[in-house]
């Protein structure tokens, strides 16, 4: 799984040098964080709607869009999928309640 995430991360990094006229991702980068966050919000909503429709194919399609735009955000902020995978590995074996209690400030 991390192979495709790594390849996407490389492509997304390269798109930082692309023209916004030639690349959808470069256009998102040029518009800035708020535009990327708006797109993530749209994709999250579409994911929820697909889940409510209870159609596996639509759920997979929308989650792929959501993951992709989340990867765009990570790249925009200078982060990599490996950073998230490391955090997930750190949490592995912790109960959700324990993990939440361990967070600074105890917020979501």
From Swiss-Prot:
Pfam family of the protein (one): PRA-PH
Any one annotated GO CC term: cytoplasm
InterPro entries assigned to the protein according to its UniProt record, in alphabetical order: HisE (IPR008179), PRib-ATP_PPHydrolase-like (IPR021130)
EC number in record: 3.6.1.31
GO molecular function: ATP binding; phosphoribosyl-ATP diphosphatase activity
Pathway: Amino-acid biosynthesis; L-histidine biosynthesis; L-histidine from 5-phospho-alpha-D-ribose 1-diphosphate: step 2/9
Keywords: Amino-acid biosynthesis, ATP-binding, Cytoplasm, Histidine biosynthesis, Hydrolase, Nucleotide-binding
Compartments where located: Cytoplasm
GO biological process, one term: L-histidine biosynthetic process
EC class (word): hydrolase
Substrates-to-products reaction catalysed: 1-(5-phospho-beta-D-ribosyl)-ATP + H2O = 1-(5-phospho-beta-D-ribosyl)-5'-AMP + diphosphate + H(+)
Keyword Hydrolase: yes
This protein's record includes keyword Repressor: no
NCBIfam families with a match to the protein in the record: histidine_hisI, PRK00400.1-3
Family under the similarity heading: Belongs to the PRA-PH family.
Record's protein name: Phosphoribosyl-ATP pyrophosphatase
Annotated source species: Thiobacillus denitrificans (strain ATCC 25259 / T1)
Lineage of producing organism: Bacteria, Pseudomonadati, Pseudomonadota, Betaproteobacteria, Nitrosomonadales
């Amino acid at each position: 799984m991390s192979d495709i995430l790594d390849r996407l991360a490389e492509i997304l990094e390269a798109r930082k040098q692309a023209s916004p006229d030639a690349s959808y991702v470069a256009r998102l980068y040029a518009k800035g964080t708020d535009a990327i966050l708006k797109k993530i919000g749209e994709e999250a909503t579409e994911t929820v709607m697909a889940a409510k429709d209870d159609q596996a194919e639509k759920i997979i399609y929308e989650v792929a869009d959501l993951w992709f735009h989340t990867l765009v955000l990570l790249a925009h902020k200078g982060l990599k999928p490996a950073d998230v995978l490391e955090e997930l590995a750190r949490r592995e074996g912790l109960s959700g309640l324990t993990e939440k209690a361990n967070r600074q400030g105890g917020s979501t």
